[in-house]
Amino acid sequence: MNPSEMQRKAPPRRRRHRNRAPLTHKMNKMVTSEEQMKLPSTKKAEPPTWAQLKKLTQLATKYLENTKVTQTPESMLLAALMIVSMVVSLPMPAGAAAANYTYWAYVPFPPLIRAVTWMDNPIEVYVNDSVWVPGPIDDRCPAKPEEEGMMINISIGYRYPPICLGTAPGCLMPAVQNWLVEVPIVSPISRFTYHMVSGMSLRPRVNYLQDFSYQRSLKFRPKGKPCPKEIPKESKNTEVLVWEECVANSAVILQNNEFGTIIDWAPRGQFYHNCSGQTQSCPSAQVSPAVDSDLTESLDKHKHKKLQSFYPWEWGEKGISTPRPKIVSPVSGPEHPELWRLTVASHHIRIWSGNQTLETRDRKPFYTVDLNSSLTVPLQSCVKPPYMLVVGNIVIKPDSQTITCENCRLLTCIDSTFNWQHRILLVRAREGVWIPVSMDRPWEASPSIHILTEVLKGVLNRSKRFIFTLIAVIMGLIAVTATGAVAGVALHSSVQSVNFVNDWQKNSTRLWNSQSSIDQKLANQINDLRQTVIWMGDRLMSLEHRFQLQCDWNTSDFCITPQIYNESEHHWDMVRRHLQGREDNLTLDISKLKEQIFKASKAHLNLVPGTEAIAGVADGLANLNPVTWVKTIGSTTIINLILILVCLFCLLLVCRCTQQL
């Protein structure tokens, strides 16, 4: 065979060698047992939460205090490991995995909002220019411009009529209002010289309180200084307007329908004919609609106004006062002067200067009011957390007591760019809600006594097992503590698993806290202090609830109470309506529920003596020390005699063995 033929035959042998490798690889992988599969109950452990670690530290500290052991890092670690091992070593009874325990929980500051109603106290509305608009000033708003205008869909309930502004049923409608002051005469032919301010305000539905007699209307008349009978006198400076609250002689109705009756006792200044002393036929002394529409037709188009008549022009309802609407039916609530500050900021205000002159035409007196405007002032009004403004196509349904709005925007400020085709709904963050939550274990104020007792028995009987358990706990501390997370609910269906409430409330807490942050450089301003007091009041109320409640040991962001949820007494539809903010006869009786929960919390204060339980564990663990065993054995006389006899017997045996050798 020549070399060329050998080269042609060599490759097949190499191919057989290469084909042998995959077979060897497969043989190495071949097993005789079935492939092991993870059981459905096997779950990946999550890292421990801060609440769990904090609670574990508190329990360890309490244990060291009760046992009078010095708190060192080593002792704290051992105490924490001991507590974790006690809880983990509890044998789970059959069917316990499927057990479901449902309790009432109080969740402070959830990610929910409610409507501000006419029965709520007035809120703080801040303006950027206090020269022309009275009220607290703050030109730093909005605090977070990047969050202005976030889209939201809402469906919330209400008990009392909500506060709404705009052209929709249940909302106060906007209109232009004028305020007039008289300045010193600057011309011999001028009877009066005026400064007038025009701005957006609240539209009266009825000029006077016609639905009640004058005597009955006095029942709703607020206390305050009556409005002046003469036009207020001001200086020549058109850049200053002094506001002074006063009460008019009669009220106007802003709303009178199924949503309630809302009135306002602020003056509504208008030009009208003064017919006193006139012998000829004089137009009605009531405000002329034509004149009124001519004065207030538009704040943009008309920069010159002229009123002419053979009769003197008179300004009715003197006074420079802002509207202060209040509800009088079906309930009587407080005044809300802050609403006007939101309305007036929706469009710039216009400043007028002019006079009233007297001439003679056809041998008759002829009166002319001439007003000119060359100055407009843009405004901005803002609210601060926990309050917000929902802007959009808001629909209020009185039959179901619900408010809906799709594709609405969340704002904190209103300025002259606002479009009155939308409506404004005042909302605020919910202070807290009561909801049922489910747990996979019974409620406990601390690691329960029976768990510690049962585990302690096993540990004392098998001390080696305790050592191995301790090592296992050290190796898997993160996985162990992660199993203690609590459960939560789904808002729109029923009671569900627990992690939902924790994440739900944690995210909302971060949201409200970020919105309520205060600029420390300007913390000395009174407005910041005022808003901080309002916000802290809600926090103190939440803390008051927490102090009165006995909470489950494994939760800190919200409180799971020992009160068991009874579905037959409070069905889920009642809970759902409570979450929506509806407080009718079908919703939860919160006051009664609180009373029951506070009683249950008080009863559990003495049912879980953690001090005795931890002390018992400490005594049991002390018995594991071999030194104590020797000390105890050596302290008895009988045992000592037996030991001496045993030693003598052994010595005797040793002596005999040595003699035989």
Swiss-Prot record:
<keyword id="KW-0732">Signal</keyword>
<dbReference type="Pfam" id="PF13804">
    <property type="entry name" value="HERV-K_env_2"/>
</dbReference>
<feature type="glycosylation site" description="N-linked (GlcNAc...) asparagine">
    <location>
        <position position="128"/>
    </location>
</feature>
<feature type="compositionally biased region" description="Basic residues">
    <location>
        <begin position="10"/>
        <end position="20"/>
    </location>
</feature>
<dbReference type="InterPro" id="IPR029104">
    <property type="entry name" value="HERV-K_env"/>
</dbReference>
<feature type="glycosylation site" description="N-linked (GlcNAc...) asparagine">
    <location>
        <position position="100"/>
    </location>
</feature>
<keyword id="KW-0895">ERV</keyword>
<feature type="glycosylation site" description="N-linked (GlcNAc...) asparagine">
    <location>
        <position position="274"/>
    </location>
</feature>
<keyword id="KW-1015">Disulfide bond</keyword>
<keyword id="KW-0814">Transposable element</keyword>
<feature type="region of interest" description="Fusion peptide">
    <location>
        <begin position="466"/>
        <end position="486"/>
    </location>
</feature>
<feature type="transmembrane region" description="Helical">
    <location>
        <begin position="633"/>
        <end position="653"/>
    </location>
</feature>
<dbReference type="GO" id="GO:0005886">
    <property type="term" value="C:plasma membrane"/>
</dbReference>
<feature type="signal peptide">
    <location>
        <begin position="1"/>
        <end position="89"/>
    </location>
</feature>
<dbReference type="Pfam" id="PF15695">
    <property type="entry name" value="HERV-K_REC"/>
</dbReference>
<feature type="glycosylation site" description="N-linked (GlcNAc...) asparagine">
    <location>
        <position position="585"/>
    </location>
</feature>
<dbReference type="InterPro" id="IPR000328">
    <property type="entry name" value="GP41-like"/>
</dbReference>
<dbReference type="Pfam" id="PF00517">
    <property type="entry name" value="GP41"/>
</dbReference>
<feature type="glycosylation site" description="N-linked (GlcNAc...) asparagine">
    <location>
        <position position="507"/>
    </location>
</feature>
<comment type="function">
    <text>Retroviral envelope proteins mediate receptor recognition and membrane fusion during early infection. Endogenous envelope proteins may have kept, lost or modified their original function during evolution.</text>
</comment>
<feature type="glycosylation site" description="N-linked (GlcNAc...) asparagine">
    <location>
        <position position="372"/>
    </location>
</feature>
<keyword id="KW-0325">Glycoprotein</keyword>
<feature type="site" description="Cleavage">
    <location>
        <begin position="465"/>
        <end position="466"/>
    </location>
</feature>
<comment type="function">
    <text>SU mediates receptor recognition.</text>
</comment>
<feature type="region of interest" description="Disordered">
    <location>
        <begin position="1"/>
        <end position="47"/>
    </location>
</feature>
<keyword id="KW-1133">Transmembrane helix</keyword>
<keyword id="KW-1003">Cell membrane</keyword>
<dbReference type="GO" id="GO:0005198">
    <property type="term" value="F:structural molecule activity"/>
</dbReference>
<comment type="subunit">
    <text>The surface (SU) and transmembrane (TM) proteins form a heterodimer. SU and TM are attached by noncovalent interactions or by a labile interchain disulfide bond.</text>
</comment>
<feature type="glycosylation site" description="N-linked (GlcNAc...) asparagine">
    <location>
        <position position="566"/>
    </location>
</feature>
<feature type="glycosylation site" description="N-linked (GlcNAc...) asparagine">
    <location>
        <position position="355"/>
    </location>
</feature>
<feature type="glycosylation site" description="N-linked (GlcNAc...) asparagine">
    <location>
        <position position="461"/>
    </location>
</feature>
<comment type="similarity">
    <text>Belongs to the beta type-B retroviral envelope protein family. HERV class-II K(HML-2) env subfamily.</text>
</comment>
<feature type="glycosylation site" description="N-linked (GlcNAc...) asparagine">
    <location>
        <position position="153"/>
    </location>
</feature>
<feature type="glycosylation site" description="N-linked (GlcNAc...) asparagine">
    <location>
        <position position="554"/>
    </location>
</feature>
<keyword id="KW-0946">Virion</keyword>
<keyword id="KW-0472">Membrane</keyword>
<dbReference type="InterPro" id="IPR051255">
    <property type="entry name" value="Retroviral_env_glycoprotein"/>
</dbReference>
<protein>
    <recommendedName>
        <fullName>Endogenous retrovirus group K member 25 Env polyprotein</fullName>
    </recommendedName>
</protein>
<keyword id="KW-0165">Cleavage on pair of basic residues</keyword>
<keyword id="KW-0812">Transmembrane</keyword>
<keyword id="KW-0261">Viral envelope protein</keyword>
